[in-house]
Every structure is written in C-alpha cells, then in structure tokens.
From Swiss-Prot:
The lineage of its organism: Eukaryota, Metazoa, Ecdysozoa, Arthropoda, Hexapoda. Disulfide bonds: none annotated. The gene is dgt4. The name 'dim gamma-tubulin 4' derives from the decreased gamma-tubulin staining of the spindle pole seen following RNAi-mediated knockdown of dgt4 in S2 cells. Component of the augmin complex composed of dgt2, dgt3, dgt4, dgt5, dgt6, msd1, msd5 and wac. The complex interacts directly or indirectly with microtubules and is required for centrosome-independent generation of spindle microtubules. The keyword Coiled coil applies. It comes from Drosophila melanogaster. It comes from the Eukaryota. As part of the augmin complex, plays a role in centrosome-independent generation of spindle microtubules. The complex is required for mitotic spindle assembly through its involvement in localizing gamma-tubulin to spindle microtubules. This is Augmin complex subunit dgt4. One of its GO terms (cellular component) is microtubule.
Length: 188
C-alpha cells in the first residue's frame, strides 16, 4: 500500500511571482549599493592619492624655492662684497695668460713626450720581479676602506661647513640690509 503524499503548504502562483520580483529588485538594489560604495571608496582613494602627490610636489617646490632664495641672497651679498672690493689687475692678467697657455696646449695635437725604450724595459722588469699584486691587494683594500670612511667624514664636515657658511652669509646679508635701510621712526 502506497502512502499518500504529505500535504505541504504552497503559495499561490501569483504570490510566488510577485515575491520573486521583489527579491530580484531587492538584490539589484543591494548590488547597486555595493557598487556605489565600491565606487565611493575608489574615488576617495584616488583623491587621497592625488592629495599626497600634490603635497609632495608642494614640499619639493617649497624646498627648491627656499634653496633658490638662499642662492639669490648669497649672490646679492657676493655682488655687494665685490662692489666694495678692488680687484688686482696683475692677478687678472696672469689668469688670462695661464688660460691662454692651457688652451694652446690642449688644442695642439703634439704628443707631450716620447718614452725612452730603456725606461720602458726597466719598468717592465720592475713589474715582473718586484710587483706582487696579490700581496698588495689586502693592504690596498684596507686603505681603500679607510679612504672611503675619510671621504664620508669629509663630506659630512663639508656639508656642515657649507650650512654654517650659508647661515653666516644670510645673517651678514640681513645685517647689511638692516644697515642700508633708513632708520625706523619711533613715535614717543
């Protein structure tokens, strides 16, 4: 004997179609909201990126502007100092002669000297007998490292000196400008 099917509650076909349409509209609405939020996040990220790029460019511009302003101040101070200094005519003439001599030597195609064959042979013998590059390599590497460290220290010292000189020149220029300005009137 077969058992009859169990009764289930079913919705009328008109409600099923309407419910399905509402569900589809709701899902479309959710998808649209998700896309809107995603687009909003993308726009916000792009705006933040452009703001960061703009701020970087602004900082670089301000840094370059400050450097140029300091250079202009230093140039103005140099011009003011040069205006008060008398140049030595003998030094200028000697420098012109030295430049002309160097120009003629560099412009000529003549070889400066011809090597003596005996000197070349003696040098080759010296290289073959006494020159030991492997033994000197460790010493040269150590000296190179010391020279590199000294160079770094020297660069640091030069940077500090340049900064100090620049600050001194700026202060001197400010004092010079204050001295050149007419005195301020005070109302008592």
């Amino acid at each position: 004997m077969e058992t009859p099917p169990t009764p289930t509650t079913t919705t009328p076909p008109s409600l099923t179609t309407e419910g399905t349409m509402d569900d589809i509209q709701y899902l479309l609405h959710l998808e649209a909201m998700r896309r809107f939020q995603e687009d909003s996040r993308n726009v916000k990220r792009q705006v933040e990126e452009q703001v960061r790029i703009w701020l970087d460019a602004k900082c670089e511009y301000q840094r370059d502007f400050g450097r140029l302003a300091r250079l202009l101040k230093c140039g103005a101070l140099q011009a003011a100092v040069d205006a008060h200094r008398v140049s030595d005519v003998n030094q200028v003439d000697q420098a012109a002669k030295d430049i002309a001599s160097l120009r003629s030597k560099l412009g000529s195609d003549l070889r400066p000297a011809i090597l003596d064959s005996n000197d070349v042979k003696q040098c080759l013998e010296h290289l073959n007998t006494t020159h030991k590059p492997r033994l000197n390599l460790c010493r040269q590497q150590r000296e190179f490292a010391q020279n590199q460290e000294a160079l770094r220290s020297l660069r640091t010292a030069v940077d500090g000196l340049e900064n100090g000189m620049e600050m001194g020149m700026i202060q001197a220029m400010d004092r010079l400008v204050e001295d050149l300005l007419p005195p301020r009137e005070t109302n008592n």
